[in-house]
Amino acid sequence: PNIELTKLQSETLKIPQITSTLNSDESSEEMIVLKTLLEKAKFDFKIDGLVHGGISSEFQKRSFEKICKESNLNTIAPLWKINSKEYMNSLLNSNFKFILTSVSSDGLDETWLGKIISMDDVSLLNKLSSKYGFNLNFEGGEAETFVTDCPLYLHPIKINKSQTVWDGYRGRFEIEDASLDSNAR
């Protein structure tokens, strides 16, 4: 959910965003579109590599490496195989503020949706992860996150209007309106 809000993240990071619409769930189609976008970024912005946030998905890592090799681009995966709890704690220690925008695992209920995650929450999530078997950093899709603020942002993202959708097992926090909070810094 909330993929359209990456535009605000791009804006506050002062990094250009290149997007495409994909009407398929086929990973082969995704890879073709990704390669096209990387080629465009290479040409338009003179990039020489891709930094991705993959932590444990071998498929994701191999896919990025293959596309980048074909496009003569470097790949960097600084979070690769990082310990989940260490990763979550490092985000908070580095002043990242993020919320959960979807949950779809036992142990994660609607109270997590839209919640700004704290150190206490990471401790609780770690316990729930052990009990219910989900990945603490949500690498398996058990939850999705959205960064509302971090040291690289010029302005935090303010959520003005949202709605929670819950079906009894999984849910989404749909951000209906958001803006850059230019008064916050």
Where do the language-model regions lie?
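Nucleotide-activated chemistry modules centered on ATP-dependent adenylation/adenylyltransferase
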Residues: 1-185
